[in-house]
């Protein structure tokens, strides 16, 4: 057995031993306190800061601020925005009314050209003389000016409107009809008397090539009227 006197000496200076044996908890506590202090300072400064109020303009006003919170310039901006919104609403209402008026006068009104066209087509389909020439009424089609393409048959009907010397309105139109047997042209001439607001037929006829004209409506001239107005070979109107 080795003698204790021969063991290596492990003597450590007293000052160094004291440093090694000193606990490190106080230093960690100091760091924790320092971090907590900095966090408290940061939180305190954030809690005291208030969000910056956005200026109200004509384009950015969303109504979040009350009228009393606005400055003079912002009140002018809000009033301008509300005026513009009102003008947009009025313009939209006027345009909508104009569209409905146009649809009524051009499509749904009994005096419209579309209405009279549909009425004339129905008269052709209901007349036995016309169906004898054209074929089955269920297969009769009516369209505008004839073209080489079947996709262009929905063209506007050729129509003219004018007033005579007495101030009476006249409407003339012609359109094509086609059935399984033949095709033809429908001639329409209507007049609106001064004392009425409805169109009256002066002529409604169907022309089919190779056949006599089929007259569905033709106004009869009042006897003696033409002779009374004709003086020295001149027809007075």
Curated annotation (Swiss-Prot):
UniProt xrefs under Gene3D superfamilies: Mitochondrial import inner membrane translocase subunit Tim21
InterPro entries: Tim21, Tim21_IMS_sf
Residues annotated as transmembrane: 84-104
Compartments where found: Mitochondrion inner membrane
Protein name per UniProt: Mitochondrial import inner membrane translocase subunit tim21
Chief location: mitochondrion
GO biological process: protein import into mitochondrial matrix
CC per GO annotation: TIM23 mitochondrial import inner membrane translocase complex
């Amino acid at each position: 057995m080795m003698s204790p006197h021969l063991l290596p000496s492990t003597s450590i200076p007293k000052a160094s031993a004291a440093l090694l044996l000193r606990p490190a908890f106080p230093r960690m506590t100091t760091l924790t306190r320092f971090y907590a202090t900095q966090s408290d300072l940061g939180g305190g400064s954030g809690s005291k800061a208030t969000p910056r109020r956005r200026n109200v303009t004509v384009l950015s006003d969303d109504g979040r601020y009350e009228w009393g919170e606005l400055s003079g310039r912002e009140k002018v901006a809000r009033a301008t925005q509300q005026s513009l919104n009102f003008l947009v609403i009025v313009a939209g209402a006027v345009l909508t009314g104009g569209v409905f008026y146009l649809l009524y006068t051009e499509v749904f009104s009994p005096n419209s050209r579309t209405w009279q066209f549909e009425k004339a087509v129905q008269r052709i389909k209901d007349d036995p003389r016309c169906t004898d020439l054209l074929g089955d009424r269920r297969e009769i089609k009516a369209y505008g000016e004839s073209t080489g393409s079947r996709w262009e048959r929905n063209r506007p009907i050729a129509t003219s409107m004018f007033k005579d010397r007495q101030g009476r309105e006249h409407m003339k139109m012609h359109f094509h009809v086609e059935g399984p047997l033949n095709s033809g042209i429908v001639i329409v001439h209507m007049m609106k008397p001064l004392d009425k607001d409805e169109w009256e037929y002066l002529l409604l006829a169907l022309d089919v090539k190779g056949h006599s004209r089929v007259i569905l409506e033709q106004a009869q001239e009042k006897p003696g009227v033409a002779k009374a107005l004709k003086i020295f070979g001149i027809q007075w109107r």
